[in-house]
Regions:
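Terminal accessory carbohydrate-recognition/targeting modules of carbohydrate-active enzymes
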Residues: 1-316
């Protein structure tokens, strides 16, 4: 039935009504630039492009008006007029990552899931999901934020032995942060992405494990964050568990109207959960660091959502 409806007429009428180009006419004009083909534009590419720029529209709203937040590496570079990666945005239809599309997947043979690590150690455990970032904040409010560091302050390596891992070493003004991210098989047989962290500071401060509503492509919504009853794990969007290994010394959480949780650090807040209708919830677990003493921590994230969705992805 729907096949016989005059879709082209409806689309043309809607385009004329809202003063935009007729998509059917535009595609017909585009085809004239190439030799005739038996195959039109691949539907998969059109679908991917729609999703790609839909995220870009969200990025344009969320990032542009909140540049005081801590954003991923590509945003900190591409949105900075003083950086060589700067891309003017005044007439951009959408804001997408055009300059730093060089993240690394960590995985295991036989495990069809691919957590990724960006050039500054930002970990995205789930496919097209939210991320974990790691910071140092001192009592005098000096900060080591990997995404904001110059290239000279960061060294990243891909290790193949004894297991596949991405290591990221950050150094600045007496602060040092070392990260090693890999995927491992947990005791119960499922895979988890794990990050080993070592923080060293020349003064007392905090190691921060932060839940971030974005990934190297842009915004990825976080609607809820909650600490579990043991106090040693976050549950994010009710789809994955962030295991902290030990109870944090302090917790901070915020929804979009309150701004980025980063703006309130270190601070003290006993809030155990947050919900955000906008999808921009942020959370931070703080662990005390003493001057000159290395602070080690292991963080792991369960990947049950990605394993559960594998049959669905195979069908699309």
């Amino acid at each position: 039935m729907f096949r016989w409806l005059p879709w082209k007429f409806f689309v043309k009428h809607a385009a004329r009504r809202y003063g935009v180009l007729d998509p059917a006419l535009l595609l017909a004009r585009m085809r004239r630039f190439a030799q005739p083909s038996e195959v039109a534009e691949p539907l998969e590419l059109l679908r991917a492009g729609i999703v790609f720029h839909a995220r870009g529209l969200v990025n344009a709203k969320a990032i542009q008006h909140n540049l005081d937040w801590v954003w991923p590496y590509w945003v900190e570079r591409q949105f900075n007029p003083a950086d060589k990666s700067f891309v003017p945005r005044a007439f951009s239809f959408s804001h997408i990552n055009l300059t730093h599309r060089n993240w690394t997947a960590v995985g295991l043979p036989g495990a069809p899931v691919y957590p990724i690590v960006d050039p500054r150690g930002l970990v995205t455990p789930l496919h097209d999901g939210w991320s974990l970032d790691f910071w140092i904040v001192t009592d005098s409010r000096r900060r080591l934020l990997p995404s904001k560091l110059d290239d000279e302050a960061v060294k990243q390596r891909l290790l193949l032995e004894p297991a596949l891992a991405v290591t990221t070493a950050c150094r600045i003004d007496g602060l040092r942060l070392d990260l090693a991210t890999s995927m491992e098989i947990a005791e119960h047989g499922s895979a988890e992405v794990r990050t080993k962290i070592r923080a060293v500071s020349d003064e007392d401060g905090w190691l921060v494990v932060a839940v971030r509503p974005y990934n190297p492509e842009g915004i990825q919504f976080v609607q809820s964050i909650a600490i579990d009853s043991s106090g040693t794990a976050f549950r994010v969007n009710d789809e994955a568990t962030v295991k902290l290994g030990e109870p944090p010394d302090s917790l901070r959480m915020a929804h979009y109207a309150e701004g980025d949780v980063y703006l309130d650090l270190p601070g003290k807040n006993g809030q155990r959960e947050v919900r955000c209708d906008v999808g921009m919830a942020t959370g931070a677990a703080l662990f005390r660091v003493h001057a000159g003493i290395p602070r080690d921590l292991g963080v792991s994230v369960t990947l049950e959502r990605d394993f559960r969705e594998l049959p669905k992805r195979a069908d699309t």
